[in-house]
Amino acid sequence: MPELFTIPLALAGISHHAADIATLEAFRFPDEAAFLHEARERFRGVLLLQTCNRIEVLVQGDARSLEGFLQEKGRHGFTVIEGEAVPRHLLELAAGIDSLIVGEDQILGQLKQALAAAEEAGTCCSAIGLCIKKAVHAGVRVRRQTQINRGAVSVGSAAVTLAENLLGTLRDRHILVVGSGEMGVLVAQALAARGLTAIYVANRTYERAVMLADKIGGRAVNFKDLYRYIALSDVVISCTAAPHPVIRTEDIRAVMEERLWPLDTHPRHLILIDIAQPRDVEEGVRSIEGVHLFTIDDLRNVNDATMESRRSEADRARGIIDEEAEHFVRLLRRAAADETLALLYTWAESIRARERDRALARLRERDDRTAEVIDDLTHALTNKILSDVTTAIRACAECGDITTAEALMRAITRGEPCFQNEE
């Protein structure tokens, strides 16, 4: 018998647990739409999740095929999980337990965006849609029933905390935020929540910079004036979605010359915090005197400082995940059973139609009414015969008793080639 009652799921990727920012950057797929289009030829369903600290590929397919596909794409050093380990991982991910900043809320939106991209690309099968929606639902429940997202709960807010730790206080400091997308909004909000007033927002689209600056009581900066404002700033937090660096080494070298007063021997220190993926700031700025560059890798220490207070909340979250995981697996088993039972009903319908036509052919005299009655009768008999057994098959599949479910299928379909067991 072909493999039934199972939806093969596999997930592969890398994350902050085992990869630094350079490794993540190298693994990233710059053209997500092209990747999904190519993967669609190999798998029934594909979803690509790319965040600041993880790149993961979820497919309806087997782990070996996924591993081979990624290796063909020049990606190595990733981990692969399959089967019922996949839904549990997605639950932990959505709950924020697996995040760099434990409890962060942004992962929920990122999962939704990845799902929307897969739907737009035509790579979202029903199983993947079910997985992501269920994971997001569970993530919302964890945050509602625990305080796991208390404190610095985003990469953006953690970047602000890092700047605060480095300087002692951000009061009377000039802070420049480069980028006004989702991460830029989080950074700006975290700054505004501290009552800071010297906040500047730069964005390639000036109107978006104005909108964000107005919301937080800051000042919008035209992107052509970026380096002039970097020269005036104490801290620059950069988080654009540009595919290439926007803050270059030679330009920062010139900026630092402007920060050197005639009687000073050293320029004023400049803190650059790059939380973009791919990177916004060229690595070469580290060689410039007075420049201090920090990246997502440096945010781990900020997270470690808050972990102790969240440990009990994480334990509570795992309890919720245990409950959700059991229900999640049952849903996937039921979905797999429904796919198999759809095949069963298709098979039964072909037999019903064949026998109906044979019966009608044997009647010497028949009219439309007779044909309608016989058609209704055969429909009713088929559904009645299958009703109880399909309920039993579905129940067995849901609780993981695949052996019994397959035995029931054999009992019904033995002798028919579409379900014949190949021994």
From Swiss-Prot:
Pathway: Porphyrin-containing compound metabolism; protoporphyrin-IX biosynthesis; 5-aminolevulinate from L-glutamyl-tRNA(Glu): step 1/2. This is Glutamyl-tRNA reductase. GO terms for molecular function: glutamyl-tRNA reductase activity; NADP binding. The keyword NADP applies. It comes from the Archaea. It comes from Methanoculleus marisnigri (strain ATCC 35101 / DSM 1498 / JR1). Possesses an unusual extended V-shaped dimeric structure with each monomer consisting of three distinct domains arranged along a curved 'spinal' alpha-helix. The N-terminal catalytic domain specifically recognizes the glutamate moiety of the substrate. The second domain is the NADPH-binding domain, and the third C-terminal domain is responsible for dimerization. It catalyses: (S)-4-amino-5-oxopentanoate + tRNA(Glu) + NADP(+) = L-glutamyl-tRNA(Glu) + NADPH + H(+). Its EC number is 1.2.1.70.
